[in-house]
Amino acid sequence: MLRSLQFYRLSSKNLLSFKTCYSFYSTKASSPLPQPSFRRFWKNTATKIQNGEVLIQLDGRNLKSPSGKIVKVPKEMELLAHLIALEWDRLPSTSVRQHNLPITSLVSRAIDISQFKKEEKELLSTQLIRFLDTDTILIYSPETEYEGKLLEEQKENWWPLKETFENKLGVQLSYLDGDAGIIAHKQTQETHERIRNWLSSLNSWQLAAFERSVSCCKSFIVSFMILKGYLNSEKAAALTNLELQYQTNRWGSLEDAHEIDNEDLKNKLASSAILSRCIEDMHDKSNEHAH
């Protein structure tokens, strides 16, 4: 019987702590500080169906998460397993970095969340709700800035997202008017409770996808749109970087730095969108079987 492979426990001169490499909260790609990396030490990748679940194998050994859990997905999400296998199959032979594994690390996070106790899930919800109080989509520029043109773009692009979010979740969101200056901003307790109830309805896969997008784009609202399939990753990144893009169009940019940052954001948001769509497919298949 083949022994499961726990990468971050391997004693190899070429392999740093896999837990560090896999850390979701990574340094941005544009950072001058080098990211942790490790060398490729396998030749073949494959998937294996076992007991209604799909496992990912490298040279016949099961892939494990940093916490030691076997990385596996339900049979109804088999596409996700193939995407993970593809990530590992396409890795270069040297200097593998964590941003090369966006889907793998996201699935690993979902597996960890599935083991959370009630208190841990509540803490995660509290952390996510804080992003709604400082949501990018709810903070508007002063009318005097850029002759009010940036504010016009924000209202045109962001306001529909705010209204959709409010209608779907039955809440009324307050927003920060730039003309009011820098002041504390927080949603009502009633809104927080409704949002908490919605978060409690999400499964571990949905929470992992949502957590990643929230942390990347700093917007609870945009992340909700990605999870529900209302926005693709390209559009979500553009909406998140609306102010930066406006300034870039006006003043120019540090080309390489901005491009790398934007690609890194789109890459992470795309992994959240992919997982969200796989979850939808799984639910659709379950409904088909039920009928």
Swiss-Prot record:
It is found in: Mitochondrion. It comes from the Eukaryota. Its main location: mitochondrion. GO terms for biological process: mitochondrial proton-transporting ATP synthase complex assembly. Keywords: Chaperone, Mitochondrion, Transit peptide. Belongs to the ATP12 family. Essential for the assembly of the mitochondrial F1-F0 complex. This is Protein atp12, mitochondrial. It comes from Schizosaccharomyces pombe (strain 972 / ATCC 24843) (Fission yeast).
